[in-house]
């Protein structure tokens, strides 16, 4: 059996909760062959792994979201081709941009077609006309040139994802929705394999929170970006055979974002019972008690309106993205 793990922005490039979980999971099944399809920003991190890869992880494929047209490993300047869509392809690409119901199979087939250039499509007349139609219907009160280039920026990483040649496997296990979920959904379309999605955090909500706080994107463009992530997650939920989350509240969020409830399994983080022996438990309780003693109120050191004298204990926190 061959399992393809699809990850974004984590394993094996950075240490963190999700990365550690992936590494442990692969090691826990030495009789299963794993391959890794990992999504990163650009080629600057190519092959820079911080984990020693397990022996049963046989191949690593990298997808770069901030990429350009490459041939035989080198960038070449070419005369731009006039790229035209079929009527069906144009209809579905319009539905994609307009946030309508999408026949994703047509989109998948379009980008896996031989000779399709992401640059030529984004800069071509069909995409221009689709964006202009969207602009006239929904965003006519903003500057068109800004809108056009923003839409090109939004769809560039998605189009690169859709052009990726997905390796064949028996099961695709995405550790998030987003671009990873798009790859998993496309793999299921072409290889007729099973698709499992395990969400440690709710990808769409995390991206939404980042965008709301971000300074690099303003006004209505925040909503356009948020809708982009929502439609990618909806695709993943629709195509997945099983979707897992860590707690009931996350399940409700997944349902709210369009995941069929019958697909969802709540799987809380496990506990290694070997570490919960009576001896270890007693030792842990003693440590907790000593820590509490540090913070206890010291007699004779209090005055009206003052705080108890305390030692400041700092904790190193690690944040794991997606």
Would you name each region that the model predicts?
Residues 147-171, 181-183, 231:
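An amphipathic, basic-hydrophobic alpha-helix
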Residues 255, 262, 271-288, 292-297, ...:
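Acidic anion/phosphate-binding donor-loop and adjacent secondary structure
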């Amino acid at each position: 059996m061959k399992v393809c793990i699809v990850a974004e922005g984590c394993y094996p490039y950075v240490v963190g909760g999700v990365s550690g979980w992936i590494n442990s999971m692969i090691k826990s099944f030495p009789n299963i062959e794993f391959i890794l399809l990992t999504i990163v920003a650009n080629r600057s991190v190519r092959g820079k792994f911080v984990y020693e890869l397990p022996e049963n992880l046989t191949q690593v494929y990298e997808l770069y979201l901030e990429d350009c047209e490459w041939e035989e490993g080198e960038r070449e300047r070419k005369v731009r081709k006039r790229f035209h869509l079929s009527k069906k392809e144009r209809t579905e690409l319009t539905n994609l941009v307009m946030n309508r119901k999408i026949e994703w199979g047509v989109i998948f087939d379009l980008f896996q077609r031989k000779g399709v250039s992401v640059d030529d499509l984004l800069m071509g007349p069909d995409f221009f006309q689709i964006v202009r139609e969207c602009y006239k219907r929904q965003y006519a009160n903003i500057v068109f040139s800004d809108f056009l280039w923003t839409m090109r920026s939004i769809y560039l990483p998605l189009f690169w994802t859709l052009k990726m040649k997905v390796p064949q496997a028996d099961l695709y296990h995405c550790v998030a929705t987003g671009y990873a979920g798009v790859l998993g959904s496309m793999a299921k379309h072409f290889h007729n394999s099973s698709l499992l999605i395990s969400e440690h955090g709710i990808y769409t909500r995390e991206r939404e929170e980042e965008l709301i706080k971000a300074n690099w994107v303003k006004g209505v463009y925040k909503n356009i970006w948020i809708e982009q992530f929502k439609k990618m997650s909806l695709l993943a939920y629709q195509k997945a055979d099983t979707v897992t989350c860590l707690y009931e509240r996350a399940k409700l969020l997944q349902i709210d974002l369009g995941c069929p409830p019958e697909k969802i399994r709540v799987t809380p983080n496990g506990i290694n019972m070997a570490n919960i022996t009576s001896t270890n438990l007693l030792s842990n309780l003693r440590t907790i008690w000593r820590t509490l003693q540090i913070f206890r109120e010291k007699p004779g050191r209090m005055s009206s309106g003052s705080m108890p004298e305390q030692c400041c204990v700092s904790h190193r926190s690690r944040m794991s993205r997606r």
